């Protein structure tokens, strides 16, 4: 039985169908769409647990219980990146204070609840269980153990036997994961855009994303003064033609509005976006308890029916010059 997706969980908290939530390693009050709705959902929750390495994220303010987690250098384990590469990460230092690794927190909780199957002696034992689940699949790492990872370096899966060097490139044997083992190319018969269409009230399409020096919701990178010198606050990138028509110039302050909320930010006029499209970075949350820089005030909760990914790249907005 599949559980709820991220956006569905907060809908359930808001309606009262779900009473409690345990948030691990994420800051949904900044990262999820329609932030003010997320905030109301957290306020409505009966019990909120936040497990993170930062106690200063926007979400931790709503935590009834804050579980301090260990950072990457403070715990042992493996990491798999987007090129299928598995790397062993050794523990360098002990975590500060009461902080524990995510694994330790979860296993301690499970044992307190008398759940079975959590009597792991080490992270290696957990990895071994995970690896065995991949046996005889297209992502087989059942033969890749800690010893090889520690002594031979990283591997790209699949690693289907003990002496296998890993698979830097897939399908070099020209055998694909189809019944015929031949590649199948499916051309779309139609292009379906279910996003809300711009109109006279909200004529611009807002797309959101990242900038060079910040990572996600800035709980780590936002503390590094040098990283804040490049772009110290969120800036709306606007096409020169749109800016000319609206009599807006670089460094002007504008109000950006959608059906979900508003933000107030500076403008940068640039050819980085096409006409009628504007860009705003998603990293900033509340500043001095004010949410006028929080981009996800604007975004909508429309999600893809298959992936459940929110429609972060397409929100209809209006833009007007700010007047004191």
What do these predicted regions represent?
Residues 1-14:
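Acidic catalytic cores of enzymes that act on phosphate-bearing nucleotides/polynucleotides
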Residues 4, 96-152, 217, 221-237, ...:
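Long, contiguous, secondary-structure-rich segments that constitute the structural scaffold
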Residues 17-29:
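Short acidic, glycine-rich surface-loop motifs adjacent to enzyme active sites
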Residues 21, 48, 66-68:
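Short, well-ordered beta-strand core segments
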Residues 27-37, 77-80:
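Glycine/threonine-rich flexible loop motifs
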Residues 43-47:
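A short helix->loop->beta-strand "cap" motif at the edges of active sites that frequently abuts
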Residues 53-90:
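Flexible glycine/proline-rich, aromatic-decorated loop/lid segments
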Residues 126-226:
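Long, low-complexity segments enriched in small/aliphatic residues
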